[in-house]
């Protein structure tokens, strides 16, 4: 009994480490795995960073590609390799900014000051402009001449959002410094906008080097399978070698399992970006426990089901019969008027036709009750108003549009427990009750 208990404790400890390592890999783009299909882009990026870090040469570059194409992973790989060269980790500074967080110049400047650990140097100094403040910060890092100054790598995530800020002051000053003989800096922007250069002001564009790296998900299914296996494998330095060997052997078996191959092929056909794969693996990893220590094909099938789940159709499963009836009435209105907007009164009239045809008093709700159910559907965002509601307009006559298509409605009704037969028949009828 005690042996089994100690074995469970060892398994629990190992699984805790597995969860930590893999979650970190899936969520934070940690540079563990090999890069696939981007060797040329990687070489270009690492050479540019080395020129800044080693030779004090300022540069600017944009990494452009759709979401999930591996922009952050590529950059993290390059930064990791750079920091492993000599004493680069001590001499090269990194400043990470995000367009979603640093929404104006003032916030960005505070974040730059914090990341460079220069709060004490700035103190209570008052600066006339953003450029003066930024120049002061970079001068504080200088040790003498250009080659011995401390290089700074600025990473601007969601770069296009910085382009929407007033006067593009941050971008202008960073690019301006990268063109002048001041502190050596590299400005690396990450964006999913292919038209990013069109967003830049003329003065900003003139100071940008126009270097761009484009990333596309160009790998095929065999490479996708290789990535799956590698992402799921534990590193060689994992403490428990025996457990790691078993885990990696299981990952290899999964990559050859016909059920898993079918799941991955379906996932690949829908969306082949790595974020989507990471989400699939994360959901499967959540099912791994002490009593179920290794991932199975069933876990991946369940994860695939959760990934492909229709959120709006899931909401329909929790609606009342009255709300279901209103959605069916709207479905018929869509069929009759060919997706044209409708109002509550039209939906109510359609619902009344159903009641009169069936002569069921059980569905005979008062109009205010039906109105309340209609408003609840609007709160759930299953229907949306076509125009802004005004104080004087009558609620019954405001135009709305249904945000569910016929397939979603019928699939949801199939899974709706205890749905009355006549309501189900009404939904499947091709014409409304006339």
From Swiss-Prot:
<keyword id="KW-0488">Methylation</keyword>
<keyword id="KW-0238">DNA-binding</keyword>
<dbReference type="GO" id="GO:0016887">
    <property type="term" value="F:ATP hydrolysis activity"/>
</dbReference>
<keyword id="KW-0539">Nucleus</keyword>
<feature type="binding site">
    <location>
        <begin position="65"/>
        <end position="72"/>
    </location>
    <ligand>
        <name>ATP</name>
    </ligand>
</feature>
<dbReference type="GO" id="GO:0051258">
    <property type="term" value="P:protein polymerization"/>
</dbReference>
<dbReference type="GO" id="GO:0000808">
    <property type="term" value="C:origin recognition complex"/>
</dbReference>
<keyword id="KW-0067">ATP-binding</keyword>
<dbReference type="GO" id="GO:0040038">
    <property type="term" value="P:polar body extrusion after meiotic divisions"/>
</dbReference>
<dbReference type="InterPro" id="IPR003593">
    <property type="entry name" value="AAA+_ATPase"/>
</dbReference>
<keyword id="KW-0547">Nucleotide-binding</keyword>
<dbReference type="Pfam" id="PF14629">
    <property type="entry name" value="ORC4_C"/>
</dbReference>
<dbReference type="InterPro" id="IPR032705">
    <property type="entry name" value="ORC4_C"/>
</dbReference>
<dbReference type="GO" id="GO:0005524">
    <property type="term" value="F:ATP binding"/>
</dbReference>
<comment type="similarity">
    <text>Belongs to the ORC4 family.</text>
</comment>
<protein>
    <recommendedName>
        <fullName>Origin recognition complex subunit 4</fullName>
    </recommendedName>
</protein>
<dbReference type="GO" id="GO:0006270">
    <property type="term" value="P:DNA replication initiation"/>
</dbReference>
<dbReference type="GO" id="GO:0005664">
    <property type="term" value="C:nuclear origin of replication recognition complex"/>
</dbReference>
<dbReference type="Pfam" id="PF00004">
    <property type="entry name" value="AAA"/>
</dbReference>
<feature type="modified residue" description="N6-methyllysine">
    <location>
        <position position="7"/>
    </location>
</feature>
<comment type="function">
    <text>Component of the origin recognition complex (ORC) that binds origins of replication. DNA-binding is ATP-dependent. The specific DNA sequences that define origins of replication have not been identified yet. ORC is required to assemble the pre-replication complex necessary to initiate DNA replication. Binds histone H3 and H4 trimethylation marks H3K9me3, H3K27me3 and H4K20me3.</text>
</comment>
<comment type="subunit">
    <text>Component of ORC, a complex composed of at least 6 subunits: ORC1, ORC2, ORC3, ORC4, ORC5 and ORC6. ORC is regulated in a cell-cycle dependent manner. It is sequentially assembled at the exit from anaphase of mitosis and disassembled as cells enter S phase. Interacts with DBF4. Interacts with POLQ.</text>
</comment>
<dbReference type="GO" id="GO:0003688">
    <property type="term" value="F:DNA replication origin binding"/>
</dbReference>
<dbReference type="InterPro" id="IPR003959">
    <property type="entry name" value="ATPase_AAA_core"/>
</dbReference>
<dbReference type="GO" id="GO:0000166">
    <property type="term" value="F:nucleotide binding"/>
</dbReference>
<dbReference type="GO" id="GO:0006260">
    <property type="term" value="P:DNA replication"/>
</dbReference>
<dbReference type="GO" id="GO:0005737">
    <property type="term" value="C:cytoplasm"/>
</dbReference>
<keyword id="KW-0235">DNA replication</keyword>
<dbReference type="GO" id="GO:0000781">
    <property type="term" value="C:chromosome, telomeric region"/>
</dbReference>
<dbReference type="InterPro" id="IPR027417">
    <property type="entry name" value="P-loop_NTPase"/>
</dbReference>
<dbReference type="GO" id="GO:0005634">
    <property type="term" value="C:nucleus"/>
</dbReference>
<dbReference type="InterPro" id="IPR016527">
    <property type="entry name" value="ORC4"/>
</dbReference>
């Amino acid at each position: 009994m005690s042996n089994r208990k100690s074995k469970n404790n060892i398994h629990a400890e190992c699984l805790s480490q597995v969860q930590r390592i893999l979650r970190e890999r899936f969520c934070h783009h940690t540079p563990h795995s090999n890069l696939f299909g981007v060797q040329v882009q990687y070489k270009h990026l690492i050479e540019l960073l080395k020129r800044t870090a080693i030779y004090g040469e300022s540069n600017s570059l944009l990494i452009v590609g759709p979401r999930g194409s591996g922009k952050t992973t590529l950059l993290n790989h390059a930064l990791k390799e750079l920091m492993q060269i000599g004493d680069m980790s001590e001499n090269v500074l990194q400043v990470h900014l995000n367009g979603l967080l640093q929404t104006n110049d003032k916030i960005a400047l505070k974040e730059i000051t914090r990341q460079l650990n220069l709060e004490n140097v700035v103190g209570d100094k008052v600066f006339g402009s953003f450029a003066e403040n930024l120049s002061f910060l970079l001068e504080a890092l200088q040790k003498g001449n250009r080659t011995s100054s401390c290089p700074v790598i600025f990473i601007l995530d969601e770069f296009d959002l910085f382009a929407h800020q007033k006067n593009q002051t941050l971008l202008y000053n960073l690019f301006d410094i990268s063109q002048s003989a001041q502190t050596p800096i590299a400005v690396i922007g990450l964006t999913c906008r292919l038209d990013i250069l069109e967003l830049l002001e003329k003065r900003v564009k003139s100071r940008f080097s126009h270097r761009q790296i484009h990333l596309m998900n160009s790998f095929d299914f065999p490479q996708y399978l290789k990535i799956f296996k590698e992402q799921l494998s534990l590193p060689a330095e994992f403490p428990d070698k025996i457990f790691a060997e078993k885990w990696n052997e299981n990952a290899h078996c999964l990559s050859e399992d016909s059920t898993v191959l079918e799941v991955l092929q379906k996932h690949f056909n829908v969306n082949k970006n790595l974020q989507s794969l990471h989400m699939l693996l994360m959901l499967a990893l959540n099912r791994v426990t002490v009593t179920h220590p290794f991932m199975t094909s069933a876990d991946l099938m369940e994860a695939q089901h959760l990934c492909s789940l229709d959120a709006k159709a899931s909401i329909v499963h929790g609606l009342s019969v009255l709300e279901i009836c209103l959605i069916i009435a709207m479905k018929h209105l869509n069929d009759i008027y060919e997706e044209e907007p409708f109002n509550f009164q039209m939906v109510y009239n359609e619902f009344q036709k159903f009641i009169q045809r069936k002569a069921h008093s059980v569905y005979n709700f008062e109009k205010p009750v039906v109105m309340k159910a209609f408003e609840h559907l609007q709160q759930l965002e299953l229907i949306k108003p076509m125009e802004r509601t005004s104080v004087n307009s009558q609620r019954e006559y405001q135009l709305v549009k249904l945000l569910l298509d016929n397939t979603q409605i019928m699939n949801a009704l199939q899974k709706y427990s205890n749905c009355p037969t006549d309501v189900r028949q009404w939904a499947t009828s091709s014409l409304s009750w006339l």
